[in-house]
Amino acid sequence: MQDFIYDKDSDGIVTVTMDMAGQNANTMNKRFEPGMRAVCDRLEAEPGLTGVVFASAKPTFFAGGDLHDILATETADAASFAFIEANKAVYRRLEKLPVPVVAAINGAALGGGYELCLACNHRIVLNSPKAVVGLPEVTLGLLPGAGGVVRLTARLGLEKALTYLLEGKQARPDAALADGLVDAIVDEPEALIPAAKAWIRANPDAHTQPWDQKGFRYPGGDALHPRVRQVIQVSSAMLFKKTRGLLPAPEKILDVAVNSMRMNFDAALRVETRRFIGLMASKEAKAAISTFFFGTQAIKSGKLRPEGARWQAGSAAVLGAGMMGSGIAYAHAKARLATRLNDTELARAEQGRAYSEALCDKAVARGRMEAAGKDALLSHITPATGNAAAGSTDIVIEAVFEDIELKEKVIAETWPMLSPEGIYGSNTSTLPISILAQACPDPSRFIGLHFFSPVDKMKVVEIIMGEQTSQETLRKAYDYVQQIGYMPIVVNDARGFFTSRVFGTFMDEGCQLLVDGMAPAAIERAAWLAGMPVGPLQVFDEVSLILGQKVRHTHRALDQRLGVDSGFGQHNTATVEVTDPMIAMGRGGRQYGGGFYDYDAQGTRVLWSGLEQFARGTADIPIQDAIDRILYRQAIETLRCLDEGVLNTEIEANLGGIFAIGFPAHTGGAIQFIRGEGVEAFAARARQLAASYGARFAVPDSIYDRLASREAAAA
């Protein structure tokens, strides 16, 4: 029992303190079950036992299952079933002890850790914001597999349990007590174990779980109760609307929770295990764990950041008070970063500040912000014209129109504002950073900072390294992005960088499907079925067809200026074929009154009837082909970016694609999607698409070979 400290006091109460050797947190690793089995053996044989307290020697109580073990699971086989059942058996033995068992929760108790708490008769938690409890498995593509679904449903009733099971909510002490996830709160760490022992002494007979008592009834009613039947129907419909059937975990959770109410407790636990091991081996779980847990952890921890001391900007200037500049200023103000919002006219700068005021007003109206909070936030934004004092600003971000000559002029004129240790960022979405850097006296301090619209909702920033950008500047930019609460994705300089290149292929494939003869509504439906937030035609209307045309013209002019053929957007032929004539017809997108859609005064949209004129083909395209074309087109472009060195890591490729572009989250990102399909299987399908629909799906075998080699090296 190297991981468990066993201590019996004079009252016969045993305190079992979990302290997993060589780990920062207690987890349900391979040593857990044998250790817990030994603990149960000793407890069952303990003479004069009057109660048990489970505590932790770590800063957290228990972190749950070992995700590395789950990633290594390939099949839902008998061995996996036996392993999970063995872990659950020790929890069942605990709740069968003839004495009360109390969980003394000093810190986070999540997943398998909270499932241990549910197997106890009483739960006392420390009054600390870090002492959260919950079952977040659904966010990892899993379900709680150590009795969590069955026990929480029995403890709270179906309706309340589903709010935690299907959303993966984590509750702080007050909320946990109010919702019945814990039974008591103590204010001091030193009071936890004494409080647990006091409860045991006061309740010596409270050792039988409610669900093991004769005549047990589920809170709120059983599965046949009219109210519960209504909850089941509504939950099923809402679940499909939210997941589109692309995420198996929520469906399995609902299935286990409902059916657990229709069978005996131990049978329900076995059903839970069967569903759990099926999810363990699923590509959706591996995608969620790899991308959303380990990937996000790598970025938050600074693993992908250059080494060096943390840097914090004390002052900022945003140049251009349009939609992007105003949004960036709002992000700064929320993070309490004093910001000078510049424009050529003070009225425009003040209008930019009014954008933040409007967002605050919405938050106040919804009860998410106090009036004083609004005033405090707005105090961090100063509308202005002209330069701030020389050397006074730690970070300057130009967010003027996507015109290279204008940007070069603004950069040169405003560079003097920078403090000696400051950095200068350009919010360009496609223009080469290395060329813009030529407008400033020190290109090593110049970097791309590409925000996404709307800035207040799209909390990711594409950081673009120019040819001369220093590692120190990258480190500061990385720290700045995290300072304002956004996710940094680092890429290297290239036309369109990463996000604009891939996003362009999504919209172009929508146009290509239109040209090939697919009905516009079917195109949008295919994107929805693929898991995209919205269809490519609607997206085009939102970003505007005219903007896309301007970007193409800008790059063509840049090619002429440099005497090169960059090949920017060379595969996006359908975009030109469809959108240029539409623009000539006055259909430039939503802000211009109409594009792919018509809009009425209330903003209701209907697909434009004139789209049929762009159909050149009459092929009956299978819906699965359309889905694959939408996904594979983006994945292939992402793979090209990774292979060309535009992207540095698969983590950034996956997270950047999901949060900046909207690549379907259930896949874990574009590169994880390829891995989930299997590199060989993906390549074979891409070759089929290339043969049927064009060379844009053709990728040299060498690129797939290099990806497979990266996989082998990682393994």
Q: Which positions does each model-derived feature cover?
A:
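Conserved CoA-thioester-binding segment of acyl-CoA-metabolizing enzymes
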Residues: M1-A55, R92
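N-terminal glycine-rich phosphate-binding loop for ADP-containing cofactors
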Residues: Q2-D9, D19, E74, F81-E85, ...
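Amphipathic alpha-helical interaction surfaces in cytosolic regulatory modules
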Residues: R31, A45, K58-A72, Y91
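Short, active-site-adjacent cap segments at secondary-structure transitions
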Residues: P59-A63, L110-G111, L431-P432
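Extended, non-globular alpha-helical segments
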Residues: D69-R93
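Gly/Ser-rich catalytic serine loop of serine hydrolases
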Residues: A103, G107-G113
